[in-house]
Amino acid sequence: MNQVTQFSGNSANLMLYWILKSYYSRFDRIMWIDTLGTFNPAALPLPCLEKTMLVRSFDAQGLKDAVDELESNLKSSEDQAYALCIDSFSNPIGLLMAQGNISFAHAFMMTLGRKCRILTRKFRLAVYLSTSLVYIKQLHLSKPALGNSWPFCLDHSYILEDQQHNKCLVHCNQSRKDLLGCSQLFLLLKGSFTHEYLTIDFYNGTPVSVSSKLHVSPSLYHSSTLNSPS
């Protein structure tokens, strides 16, 4: 389970597009859950789009139904590798919380989060989702939305920090492996991210060594994002 927290607008979604463009060849099928109605097919290459099933889910129940459908697909094709991208996990959960029953919304969120994480352990599945950044006035700092319990569902959490001159710094603020504190600099060119030197392998969930830039293991599913995912 990988979370990307945006600094503004659709910055986290640009990160999800970049991840798919970089690693789509590792997956047989991709499900993109669009909770905002902003999916941009022009951001992905045609071979990636051909593998992608787009699901529009604007509320929490629709999000759950999409994950249930993915689980059914995984059970019927256990030999295939899947990627799940959720373009704004915090949006449907926030709408559910706004209805007033905070306890129910929190339980719903944690149940769905744990289910996604369990699926990454049982099947060849990598999960990438974006969330919003909220400002905590009392602490004078910003942090990912969804509260203090949600990080227990994650393997890696990244925060995007806006830099000057069309630069964006991706900082790992939570990791079950050895990514904590690692940063990746991206350049924003023509509405999409690119990089000069890759320091984080977002597929294996590991730092990229100088001598093995995105080395692919002979066994594809040795990856920590598949079967033992990040």
Curated annotation (Swiss-Prot):
The keyword Repressor does not apply. GO terms for cellular component: cytoplasm; cytosol; nucleus; Shu complex. The lineage of its organism: Eukaryota, Fungi, Dikarya, Ascomycota, Taphrinomycotina. InterPro entries: HRR_RAD51_Paralog, P-loop_NTPase. It is found in: Cytoplasm; Nucleus. One of its GO terms (biological process) is recombinational repair. It comes from the Eukaryota. Its main location: cytoplasm. This is DNA repair protein rdl1. The keyword Nucleus applies. Involved in homologous recombination where it functions at an early stage of recombination in a pre-recombinogenic complex with rlp1 and sws1. Also has a role at a later stage of recombination in association with the rhp55-rhp57 complex. Interacts with rlp1 and sws1. Keywords: Cytoplasm, Nucleus.
